[in-house]
UniProtKB/Swiss-Prot annotation:
InterPro entries: L-lactate/malate_DH, L-lactate_DH, L-lactate_DH_AS, Lactate/malate_DH_C, Lactate/malate_DH_N, Lactate_DH/Glyco_Ohase_4_C, NAD(P)-bd_dom_sf. The active site is at 193 (proton acceptor). Substrate binds at residues 106, 138, 169, 248. One of its GO terms (cellular component) is cytoplasm. Signal peptide: none annotated. This is L-lactate dehydrogenase A chain. PROSITE patterns: L_LDH (PS00064). The gene is LDHA. It is found in: Cytoplasm. It catalyses: (S)-lactate + NAD(+) = pyruvate + NADH + H(+). PANTHER family: L-2-HYDROXYCARBOXYLATE DEHYDROGENASE (NAD(P)(+)), L-LACTATE DEHYDROGENASE A CHAIN. Its EC number is 1.1.1.27. Interconverts simultaneously and stereospecifically pyruvate and lactate with concomitant interconversion of NADH and NAD(+). Pfam families: Ldh_1_C (PF02866), Ldh_1_N (PF00056).
């Protein structure tokens, strides 16, 4: 009789129990691991699977997380190069891809990452045909479109992390200037994640008080207080962090865990995330851009009809045209 048998009396033989709330993270670079630890700290999954092509790094990251099991509430952490390890995931988060270099525009990354997605997405679909896909790799709006096309999934199940982080950065920077916590600074950035994102100045408010009504020049070139600089800081922030530490990780990891929580707990919160916007705000092509979306366990169920000023809508359409110009040239 083994020590285990002496210690434990078995009363029911379990068949291999299937995870009910499994999350997979594809790519164990700085962003993937920041997503993983943020998800683990929020107790969102009963199983976390990690996938990557670099096997030593992958195993090392898995072991490092497993060694912290005592301090976590996720009973199973697994990893593998083979996508069989991802089977039956409810949510699959794609962070894999070529990393943005210092000074490199997100859109330059695109064809490099399309080729990587041609391998990843069919494997994810094979093992988790009913999952939600959350794309984080850049340029995120185009790669969300690519994931949608390759997966064959309905559009509500293919989500881009989009402007969830841009809006968080915006709220943080507004809060810094006002001396108020970002949770109480309500503001939205829509459109493309990154260089041509659109700040909705007309909707910025604190406790329902519209800042543009108090200060009509808000966000314009003629503003003596230069609030427009706040949006410029949002656009520049990733480039600044990359220049200083080589990559971004923590904020995007927290942002992704925020989205994962909304999905896994069916919270139906509204997030500025990338979805198919054809037919909205005058967009005519199959383009994914961030708009405020209701998110839950089945993915994106609804889109909030934002009231945008004509110049805000023009910027959104211009973003869509830029993205479509690149998308139509893609080889996949």
């Amino acid at each position: 009789m083994s020590l285990k048998e002496k210690l434990i009396e078995n009363v029911h033989k379990e068949e291999h129990p299937q995870a009910h709330n499994k999350i997979t993270v594809v790519g164990v670079g700085a962003v993937g691991m920041a997503c993983a630890i943020s998800i683990l700290m929020k107790d969102l999954a009963d199983e976390l699977a990690l996938v990557d092509v670099v096997e030593d790094k992958l195993k090392g990251e898995m072991l490092d997380l497993q060694h912290g099991s005592l301090f976590l509430r996720t009973p199973k952490i697994v990893s593998g190069k083979d996508y069989a390890v991802t089977a039956h995931s409810k949510l699959v988060i794609i962070t894999a891809g070529a990393r943005q270099q210092e000074g490199e525009f997100r859109l330059n990354l695109v064809q490099r990452n399309v080729n990587i997605f041609k391998f990843i997405i069919p494997n994810v679909v094979k093992y988790s045909p009913h999952c939600k896909l959350l794309v984080v790799s850049n340029p995120v709006d185009i790669l969300t479109y690519v994931a949608w096309k390759i997966s064959g999934f309905p559009k509500h199940r293919v989500i881009g992390s989009g402007c969830n982080l841009d809006s968080a950065r915006f709220r943080h920077l507004l809060g810094e200037r006002l001396g108020i916590h970002p949770l109480s600074c309500h503001s939205w950035i829509v459109g493309e994640h990154g260089d041509s994102s659109v700040p909705v100045w007309s909707g910025v408010n604190v406790a329902g008080v519209c800042l543009k009504e108090l200060h009509p020049e808000l966000g314009t070139d003629g503003d003596k207080e230069n609030w427009k600089e706040v949006h410029k800081q949002v656009v520049d922030s990733a480039y600044e962090v990359i220049k200083l530490k080589g990559y971004t990780s923590w904020a995007i990891g927290l942002s992704v865990a925020d989205l994962a929580e909304t999905i896994m707990k069916n919270l139906r919160r509204v997030h500025p995330i990338s979805t198919m916007v054809k037919g909205m705000h005058g967009v005519k092509d199959d383009v994914f851009l961030s708009v405020p979306c209701v998110l839950g366990s089945s993915g994106i169920t609804d889109v909030i009809k934002m009231t945008l000023k004509s110049e805000e809508e023009d910027k959104l359409r211009k973003s869509a045209d830029t993205l479509w110009g690149i998308q139509k040239e893609l080889q996949f």
